[in-house]
């Protein structure tokens, strides 16, 4: 098969200064949680994308000086010549597949807490941007930069440019985005200088012009110089000579760098989850740039399909299709389009688990692509898997994300697999959760795996089949794995946060009951002590059904873990927009027929609140009765010829969908090893002691 004519435009080469990208697929800089501490992990992950057809592969943010220290978050570093070596493996891995390697320079300015280096932050005017999340807070106000500091900043960029060229990078970024130092020079709120670097936009952009010009002089024909810039706030600032300060900026500086990479000033707005944005949501912020420059323009926008990608090119919005999340979910997306295999694309679901990994300081993970982050330490590959080691057969019980991933990966290895599920449709929890507001993209977890399984002739599917232990013993499979999910339980929590069971009544429900269409009263109270999305989603869903909704949580906000996935503020806004009453820092301690008694988490003050129906969201229990029954009868397992029995996914340890998919993939990769899969057989990266 060959590329669909509609998508040929995506494979045009693009000249970027002295370099040429072989197509328009551009992996923009994105954090991957490895930094300089895990050079092999970084190289393998970026190299896989180059193998998959991306023409440009960039690092995440790379600090150029100790005054831009972002610990404890895992940033890349190019402070001195000793840092060069850690970048070379990535550059080599990218070049091996005829792709360009880019590096994104980062100076955080007032944002950089410098917790490790203990240097004072620096900024144009000594103004610290106030934030609401603890991880971004620090106690040191920035120093006001003098002319010497500005000269030093430029020199740090030039020194880093020379080091990047030594490492072999093809594209070098000057980063004027988010709340970082070059951006603060552009921003009238954070730059109130009275010298030639402040005042008019022409003056405020002077530093950028000097950085770009001098970096280009150092790079020569060895590397292109790109600029990554946030436009949303500049678009809101009035200009005396143009439509906005953003327009004026590009009119002044549009031809200076070799490429423009457009982003927003706030990461959570640029990379919202699929609950809160549609593909192409960035067009209001990047669609004007091409009219003001002849240089190539790249931008993101949660592009997951070749149709919207090609439309961005054909409609003159972008020159190159920028991607972070789609390149994580399917590193081979470009090659699949080139080969006419669009139906085989593993589409990003927009869950932002990848973003959450950076915010937690760990290597990036992906719900759709369980090999992400495991390329080096486990040797996993998104499109290849080791062949079977025997002719044994495998029975997978449960058709949710864990069971589907196990089935697909086992079948790709060459095993004969049967998957049985008690429902009439494969999907498990995905079928329920994808019906909630904004969650339809989660169906891609099921759709991808079912479509791939249907192309294989070594998988048998048995739906509407509830197997009991005797059935399993009689079926004659060599290996059995249960992936039977978990169920929400009717429970509240005690003062130690342990779940306390609550008797079910005709007015007390769980999400399981809501999914089944239980009869709710006009007023519904939700007690949510789950960290993640279910409580807020239940509130939205029930509100959309026409009920009045109150949500009570013991935490400071609803769905607090969702800060990690860049969703917590959007969740808060959505609840406010839907007029859902939120009571935080309270837990239910008693339930009466028409009221609940709540206890304030700080003051211990108790209050009675009237209620209608009550939905309890917080504790899930493994559906492991089948597994336990089989496991308890080892003699019967032996007599029936079952060599191994495993329990995976939510039926083993309830978690997010990403954990279930990973569990299925891990099982398929390791079930025929001599060692138990609980023995973590992966490589570690060790520091060199000097």
Locations of regions flagged by a protein language model:
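N-terminal Rossmann-like dinucleotide/flavin-binding domain of flavoprotein oxidoreductases
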Residues: 428-477, 562-587, 594-595
């Amino acid at each position: 098969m060959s590329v669909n004519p509609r998508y040929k435009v995506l494979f045009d080469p693009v000249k970027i200064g002295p370099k040429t990208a072989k197509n328009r697929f551009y992996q923009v800089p994105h954090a991957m949680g490895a930094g300089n501490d895990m050079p092999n992990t970084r190289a393998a992950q970026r190299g896989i994308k180059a193998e998959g057809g991306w023409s440009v592969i960039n690092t995440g943010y790379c600090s150029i000086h100790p005054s831009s220290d972002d610990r404890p978050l895992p940033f890349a570093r190019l402070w001195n010549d000793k840092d060069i070596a850690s970048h070379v493996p990535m550059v080599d891995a990218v070049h091996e597949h005829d792709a360009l390697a880019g590096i994104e320079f980062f100076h955080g300015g007032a944002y950089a807490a410098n917790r490790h280096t203990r240097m004072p932050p620096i900024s144009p005017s000594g103004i610290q941007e106030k934030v609401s999340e603890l991880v971004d807070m620090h106690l040191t106000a920035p120093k006001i930069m003098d002319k010497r500091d500005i000269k030093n900043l430029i020199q740090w960029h030039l020194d880093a440019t020379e080091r990047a060229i030594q490492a072999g990078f093809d594209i070098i970024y000057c980063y004027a985005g988010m709340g970082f130092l070059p951006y603060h020079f552009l921003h009238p709120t954070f730059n109130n200088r009275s010298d030639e670097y402040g005042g008019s936009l022409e003056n405020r952009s002077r530093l950028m012009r000097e950085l770009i010009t001098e970096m280009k002089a150092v790079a020569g024909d060895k590397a292109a110089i790109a600029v990554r810039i946030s436009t949303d706030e500049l678009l809101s600032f009035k200009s005396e000579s143009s439509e906005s300060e953003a327009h004026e900026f590009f009119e002044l500086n549009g031809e200076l760098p070799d490429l423009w990479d457009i982003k927003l000033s706030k990461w959570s707005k640029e990379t919202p989850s699929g609950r809160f944005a549609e593909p192409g949501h960035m067009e209001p912020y990047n669609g004007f740039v091409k009219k003001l420059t002849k240089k190539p323009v790249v931008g993101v926008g949660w592009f997951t399909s070749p149709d919207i990608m090609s439309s961005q090119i054909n409609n003159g919005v972008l020159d190159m299709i920028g991607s972070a999340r789609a390149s994580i979910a399917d590193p081979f997306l470009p090659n699949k389009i080139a080969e006419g295999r669009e139906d085989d694309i593993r589409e990003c679901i927009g869950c932002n688990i990848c973003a959450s990994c950076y915010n937690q300081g760990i290597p990036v993970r992906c719900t759709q692509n369980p090999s992400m982050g495991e390329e080096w330490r486990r040797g996993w590959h998104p499109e290849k898997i080791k062949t079977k080691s025997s002719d044994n057969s495998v029975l997978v019980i449960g058709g949710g994300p864990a069971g589907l991933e196990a089935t697909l990966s086992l079948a790709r290895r060459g095993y004969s697999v049967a998957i049985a599920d008690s429902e009439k449709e494969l999907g498990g929890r995905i079928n329920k959760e994808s019906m909630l507001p904004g969650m339809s993209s989660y169906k891609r977890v099921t759709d991808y795996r079912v479509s791939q399984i249907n192309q294989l002739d070594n998988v048998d599917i048995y739906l509407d089949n509830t197997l009991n232990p005797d059935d399993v013993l009689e079926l004659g499979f060599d290996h059995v794995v249960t992936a039977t999910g978990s169920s929400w339980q009717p429970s509240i929590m005690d003062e130690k946060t342990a779940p306390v069971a609550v008797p079910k009544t005709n007015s007390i429900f769980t999400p399981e009951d809501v999914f089944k269409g239980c009869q709710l009263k006009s007023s519904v109270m939700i007690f949510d002590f789950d960290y993640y999305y279910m409580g807020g989603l239940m509130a939205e869903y029930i509100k959309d059904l026409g009920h009045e909704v109150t949500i009570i949580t013991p935490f400071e906000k609803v769905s607090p873990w969702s800060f990690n996935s860049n969703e917590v503020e959007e969740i808060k806004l959505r609840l406010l927009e839907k007029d859902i009453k939120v009571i935080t820092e309270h837990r239910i301690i008693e339930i009466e027929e028409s009221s609940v008694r709540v206890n304030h988490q700080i003051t211990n003050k108790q209050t009675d609140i009237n209620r209608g129906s009550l939905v309890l969201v917080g504790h899930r229990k493994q559906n492991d009765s089948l597994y336990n029954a089989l496991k308890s009868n080892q003699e019967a397992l032996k007599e029936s010829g079952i060599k191994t029995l495993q329990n995976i996914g939510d039926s083993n340890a309830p978690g997010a969908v990403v954990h279930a998919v990973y569990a299925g993939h891990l099982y398929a990769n390791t079930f025929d090893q001599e060692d138990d899969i609980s023995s973590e057989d992966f490589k570690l990266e060790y520091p060199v002691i000097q």
